[in-house]
């Protein structure tokens, strides 16, 4: 029929991707907001480590000194494939279903489009949660472990600002000094990573120990020493705002969002309970997407420079109609050592 609608045509699938509601993910959206798509399967990125070298004094008759290009390293990465699929039933909604009101105001293609969008949202939600997990892994370890069917590798970004408090220096123990730690760590990042870390994100146990620390409570009670204020309040998406410290100049947050670990089927926090992350609130790391490719039913290869590719295909024995999402994301902290992570308890 000339007017028959095929909801699986690329233009309809692309519209489903475009109109889908966005999931809000704190770590991914806040710190990896520099989104770029690439026309290649590999992504080449300049990893920057700055310095504080000063310009030299020179005699007027000698002339200027040539400044050597330094401080960055170009690395090539192959973004991992994320490729969830679902058996779609959206095409069934093009026909009136048994028991459906024949006077329903919705057109068949509208019902089918709604079902298609629901199915895409399910795939997109899973993919977005994986990207949030990737952001957490990169920020808390400086690495990304890519492990799945047929793939097992570690992408290391060369991150070195890692602290591990031991023995009585751990928070909650006799020699603990959370306030002093934050002051020292901020200075460390300023000197080694050339960044102003004005935001602290704590795991649940770390946050509880920080808020209960006797030195912190004592400093807050000193009327002539305005160190800051703690006024906890819950925000959306598992985020809690605890307050602000004027010295060392940081806002303190807790992040309680969890994920289902598919390796052991247990629920785990994205920010480990015993960990603290100090990071610039203005961090603008890269969220890169490699080229998507697929083979169609006519055995022709297609490519797309996009963050999400949605397509359908048919398999037989048994006959099934699949809806598939493809993406090649890689979250890249291109300004290495501009943040710090610490295991505090």
Regions found by a protein language model. Give the residues of each.
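Long, contiguous amphipathic alpha-helices that act as assembly "spine/axial" helices in icosahedral shell
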Residues: 84-159, 177, 181, 187-205, ...
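A general structural signal for short secondary-structure junctions and capping/turn motifs
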Residues: 35-36, 189-194, 199, 268, ...
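N-terminal alpha-helical "arm" segments
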Residues: 1-43, 332-345
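Assembly/oligomerization interface modules of large self-assembling protein complexes
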Residues: 34-102
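A surface/extracellular/periplasmic glyco- and lipid-processing/surface-interacting theme
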Residues: 165-180
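Ordered core of a single globular domain
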Residues: 180-239
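Extended, non-catalytic scaffold segments that flank or surround catalytic motifs
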Residues: 43, 53, 154-161
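Sequence/fold signature of self-assembling virion shell proteins
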Residues: 217-345
